[in-house]
């Protein structure tokens, strides 16, 4: 018997199956997905690899074939279904098989189990009381305290007893030696959330919610598995619909995965699921320790979990009876991986569901154009929620033209109308959210006399100013002190866009000194639990104003928020990215949706220098379909997804001349292997950031109406790169329908 092994070396030339003989002592023990140790290369170096299959017949002389040495210690096996999914990901998105296998492995190695010690009384009650009298008679007070506590409660936590009774460990050992008590260990799970299942209040669903639940349940009962788009306005009760769908799936003996963007994966959100489903729920997120993540996967394997909630990585939870995958806020760009393989959770979830006979539900108030287009084409079924629950009205939205504010002498980033409304809300003890679509204290630094922009010496990007007199590169982390004079002309006059969250906070505190202000951005939430602490403070009304970047608009529900101000609404509108209009519309609509979710009506002020742009006009009207029609006309005209398919080929190397030459050769090859008129090849060009960490970058774009045509060309290009030395010392990655233009 022979094992097919993918070795753990990320190199295109080694991206193939290697056959090894299975020794007699491992026969019957190896399974697909197991990590093993094998001899590799001329020197028979011991390396790890994964079993991807078995065969009865040797592909070459059996006497020359090497043997599998052993099963890797502390390894975690990949479920065989996920090995098949990894193969699909490699084929669909590029990269090597070992990269795909490591992607579908939620945890990389075993962690030591956490144990809890208990103390148990061994003596019958009468004998124990006699022993207690003896200890008291001998004035052995510590032993007497311990025995008295155990007579009161025969089994207790070891650490609790030590601290509560002020005992030394030698006292416990002495009674253990006398056979008075026994010390026992039991495994305890490192659970990231302490939950308490509560009695459910009866939920009265709207007719629209009931219709969505009925459609899904009827299909599920009939064995129909498909992809649904739950398109509902902000506050329409999508989460309640998800939970009813999950309940239906659980009643059929199946399991569910709920994907939520990391930025929206808050305690408040998770507790809604714990309250409904109790201990059958688990969670994954990047803030958990390796031990916590390992314990949750162990619970999954033991069948103790039926619902896994988490970001993109939770998609690979090894459930045996997967019945449903929910992707909340499906439009979020974080569902697309920026690491090889550059997979999208939406397409990968649909493929996993197809393999395992499950359904997929995508939810959003602002669906991605891809999802809405798929509904129009009949690939997904749309379920609509047009109204908020509780008959709450959508907030009134006003657009403030900042050009007019300048004409009237207002140079503040806060419009006059926003200031008036903020004062009004503060007097009424209502809460306010101010959203700024950027990070940091200020943007780029330029000198007005000559226009020089201060850039990172290692990357082709401008430095951002942070409080404390530092300029920081957000690509490589380079830091330097803020310059006072221009290094080119010596001018001291500094310009640039100076509106970061820190400066907004300073401005608000000056304008409204009586207000309690919270700031939520990457800097204030970098510590574990920082995100939850800020949200909890705001939810408990310990602050009047929350200022933040896009993380404050992601699905949070604060009933006392009646005013939302969107500052610099068009900051994301003029980036060199074909999705900029869509992203702007989504952010503005999601931000507006935070207002008026309680009993009091909400108002939204959108501040912009581009009030006539359709993304801003449609967001102010909460008109998704109007926006979709305009944006699809643009995508059709330009040949951008979803109207056609796009593949980016990103090439990096330390020698700029060699990289430029190699990119030209690769472009010519792509044209040669594509049929006439089937593919449009654009580039090669330098991306907007042409150099990062002293490594140069080039990009080639390929457009086609058919996704599989691009996959076929990608396969041709991979083989061409593998056999040509001109691509040595270069890194080449493929990205299908990229979320970010390079």
Residue ranges and their predicted role:
Residues 1-311, 315-364, 376-392, 673-676, ...:
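Accessory, non-ATPase domains that flank or precede helicase/AAA+ motor cores in DNA-metabolism machines
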Residues 2, 15, 44, 429, ...:
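A general secondary-structure signal for short beta-strands and their flanking turns/coil
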């Amino acid at each position: 018997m022979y094992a097919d092994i993918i070795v753990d070396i990320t190199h295109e030339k080694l991206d193939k199956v290697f056959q090894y003989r299975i020794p007699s002592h491992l026969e019957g023990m190896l399974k697909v997905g197991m990590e093993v140790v094998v001899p590799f290369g001329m020197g028979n170096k011991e390396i790890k690899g994964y079993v991807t299959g078995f065969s009865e017949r040797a592909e070459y002389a059996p006497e020359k074939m090497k043997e599998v040495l052993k099963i890797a210690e502390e390894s975690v096996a990949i479920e065989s279904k996920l090995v098949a999914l990894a193969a699909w990901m490699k084929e669909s998105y590029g990269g090597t098989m070992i990269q795909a296998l490591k992607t579908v492995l939620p945890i990389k190695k075993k962690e030591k189990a956490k144990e809890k010690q208990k103390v148990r009384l061994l003596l019958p009650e009468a004998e124990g009381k006699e022993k207690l009298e003896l200890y008291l008679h001998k004035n052995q007070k510590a032993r007497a305290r311990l025995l008295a506590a155990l007579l009161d409660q025969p089994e207790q936590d070891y650490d609790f007893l030590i601290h509560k009774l002020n005992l030394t460990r030698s006292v416990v050992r002495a009674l253990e030696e006398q056979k008075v008590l026994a010390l026992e260990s039991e495994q305890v799970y490192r659970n990231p959330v302490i939950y308490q299942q509560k009695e459910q209040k009866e939920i009265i669903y709207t007719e629209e919610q009931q219709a969505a639940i009925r459609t899904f349940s009827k299909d599920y009962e009939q064995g129909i598995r498909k992809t649904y788009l739950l398109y509902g306005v902000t506050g329409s009760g999508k989460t309640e619909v998800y939970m009813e769908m999950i309940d239906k799936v659980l009643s059929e003996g199946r399991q569910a995965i709920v994907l939520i963007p990391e930025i929206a994966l808050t305690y408040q959100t998770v507790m809604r699921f714990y309250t409904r489903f109790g201990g059958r729920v688990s969670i994954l997120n990047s803030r958990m320790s390796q031990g916590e993540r390992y314990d949750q996967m162990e619970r999954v394997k033991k069948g103790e979990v039926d619902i896994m909630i988490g970001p993109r990585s939770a998609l690979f939870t090894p459930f045996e009876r997967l019945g449903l995958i929910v992707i909340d806020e499906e439009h979020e760009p974080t569902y697309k991986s920026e690491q090889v393989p550059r997979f999208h959770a939406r397409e990968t979830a649909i493929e996993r569901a197809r393999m395992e006979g499950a359904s997929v539900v995508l939810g959003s108030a602002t669906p991605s154009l891809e999802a809405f287009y798929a509904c129009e084409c009949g690939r997904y079924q749309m379920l609509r929620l047009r109204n908020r629950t509780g008959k709450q009205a959508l907030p009134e939205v006003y657009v403030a033209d900042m050009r007019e504010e300048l004409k009237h002498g207002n140079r503040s980033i806060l419009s006059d109308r926003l200031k008036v409304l903020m004062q009004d809300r503060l007097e009424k003890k209502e809460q306010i959210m101010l959203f700024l679509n950027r990070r940091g204290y200020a943007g780029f630094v330029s000198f007005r006399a000559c226009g020089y922009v201060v850039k990172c010496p290692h990357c082709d990007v401008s430095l951002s100013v942070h409080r404390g007199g530092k300029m920081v590169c957000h690509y490589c982390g380079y830091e330097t002190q803020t310059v006072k004079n221009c290094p080119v002309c010596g001018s001291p006059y500094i310009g640039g866009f100076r509106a970061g969250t820190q400066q907004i906070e300073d401005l608000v505190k000056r304008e409204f000194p009586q207000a309690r202000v919270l700031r939520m951005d990457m800097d204030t939430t970098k510590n574990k639990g920082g995100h939850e602490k800020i949200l909890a403070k705001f939810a408990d009304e310990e602050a009047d104003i929350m200022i933040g970047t896009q993380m404050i608009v992601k699905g949070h529900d604060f009933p006392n928020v009646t005013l939302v101000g969107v500052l610099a609404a068009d900051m994301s509108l003029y980036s060199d990215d074909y999705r900029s209009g869509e992203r702007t519309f989504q952010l503005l609509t999601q931000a507006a949706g935070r207002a008026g979710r309680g009993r009091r009506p909400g108002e939204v002020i959108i501040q912009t220098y581009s009030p006539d742009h359709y993304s801003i006009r449609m967001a102010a009207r909460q008109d998704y379909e109007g926006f979709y029609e305009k944006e699809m006309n643009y995508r059709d005209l330009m040949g951008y997804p979803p109207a056609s398919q796009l593949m980016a080929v990103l090439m990096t190397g330390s020698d700029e001349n060699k990289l430029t030459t190699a990119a030209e050769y690769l472009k010519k090859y792509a044209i040669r292997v594509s049929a006439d008129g089937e593919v449009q090849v654009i580039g090669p060009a330098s991306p907007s950031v042409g150099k990062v960490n002293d490594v140069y970058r080039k990009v080639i774009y390929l457009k086609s109406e058919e996704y599989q045509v691009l996959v076929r060309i990608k396969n041709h290009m991979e083989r061409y790169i593998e056999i040509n030395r001109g691509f040595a010392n270069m890194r080449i990655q493929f990205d299908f329908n990229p979320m970010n233009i390079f």
